[in-house]
Structures are given as structure tokens and as C-alpha cells.
């Protein structure tokens, strides 16, 4: 019988859910897994081979629309789900499985969901500091999932598949050089406190180009201005080795470009988790956030930050107005880390 997973709203969190997904499939390989999520995070689930069907949530962020949710849930009844894992903590995310009459509905307590979940767990954050472990714990009976260290099985690192035909198209369309490609993701949608200075990025890009690499810039449409600013700061004669794709790729296409890269440089972002899940050498720059909660889950990843007493603060804007955790992280440190990471697959 099929299982319905109500997936997270954010790309990085969806990748963190892959540990649970792969675990569920390993225990019941013949049971289909259906993923319900918003379109932007659902694109990631399409690259998880354990997910048998993806279902787009037809409601915008914050929309309740009880009548429409009821009608949508009634359609899901025909799939005869025997259980549902509700990964977001919101009230809205638990409504549809309950309305669909799914008999087992498993999730953390969250937002006023007492009567909507049949297996309600109370989260002690200190016992489950990593998001991947919080999701994984839902796959076990509550009495076997008291802390991350006590889980009967540790979650596997997330893995996303790449599409070779898509990669070939991207190489041809944008003149990408598989032999020397380095992906840079300079955007920071969370807020400016998470962003390494653009002039640092432009210096890093220049040094990598001087070393013979081709640079591809990746990000969402919200990152396009930062990528244009970065491009403008690179000497014009060197821009033939710089391809700006920020805002021009879908999430699956970003997965495929990253899969072609010799190394990837990102902030703590959704694309950081994408890079980790493709297994590419990764340098992740952490500012106000902490790798304890949402680390890049890959043996090919290293994290960098500049140690300051106020780290981590988890603020969108630096309350002390110095952003030293990132601004004091030197180009030399990042360049050396990228060079060392590239050597790991040389």
C-alpha cells in the first residue's frame, strides 16, 4: 500500500528528508512512496529515485482555503494511503492527510495539530540538533526514537540523481567546459547576514579563472542582481571564462550543472544541500547559521567561517553591523579550500 509524505517547503529541507525516504523504501521496497509538496521543493523530489510519484500542492504559501483543501484531499482518498508522514510543523500541512482519511498520520507536534495526527511526537531540539535526524526519527516507533544518538539506524546521506541528457543540453547551450568547471552560488535569500561580500567573490572568481577554471554562477531569480554585480567586478578580459546562469535554470538544471562541476562554493543555502547531495567537492561558507543544525551532508564537503564570539546568531541582518563571521573570512582561505577540494577528485 502506498505511503504519502507531506514534504517540506524549502529545497534544503526537502533534501534533508531524503534520509527518511530512502529508509522507508529500504524497509518496504514494493510500497510506493508519493511526495506531496509545493512546486519549488517538489522539483528536488523528482531527482530522488525512491519517490514513485510527485503531487504538487495546489495552494500558495499561507493560503488556507479549507473548501479547496477538502476537495483536494477527497481526490487523494482514491490512492488508499495506509500512512502519511507530515514533515512540516504547520497546521495546514496536517489538514490534507486528515481530510483524506489516511489512518496513520505521523509527525512532530507543531502548530495546533493534536487532533490531526494519530502518532504525535514531541520534539526535544537538543536531542535532535540536525534536521535530517528529526525527519528520520519519524520512521521509527516513538519509544525507539528518543534522540539522534539512539536511533536504530542512522540516516544515509541524501543523494540526488543527475540527468546526462540534460547535462549534455546545458553544456551545448551555455558553452560549459566539463573539464574545468567550478560552480559559484553567491546569493543569500535568507538575508544579507548570510552573504560573503560580493567583492570577495569577484576576487575568488578572478583567481580561479587565472588558474585555468571556467566559472558558472548559479542561483534563483532573487540572486540575479548579486551575480550581475559580481560579473561586473570581474575584469572584462576574463569574463569569457565566466558564465552567469543565476535565475536562468530550474532546480533540476542546477542539480545537473552542479553535477558537472569540479567544485562548488555556496553559502548555507538550498544549493549547498544540492551540491552535497550530488557528491561534488563543496566549500560551504557559514555566517550567522550553524553547521550543527543543517550541515552539508557529504564526505566531500568542508565548512568555513570566521570565528567570532557572537556566532551563531541566526539573524537575517547582523545586529552588530560588522558581519565579521563572513566579512573577515579571507579570499585566501576560501581559494585554498577550493583548490584542496578539487584535488580530491583530480
Enumerate the predicted regions with their spans.
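Catalytic machinery of carbohydrate-active enzymes
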Residues: 1-346
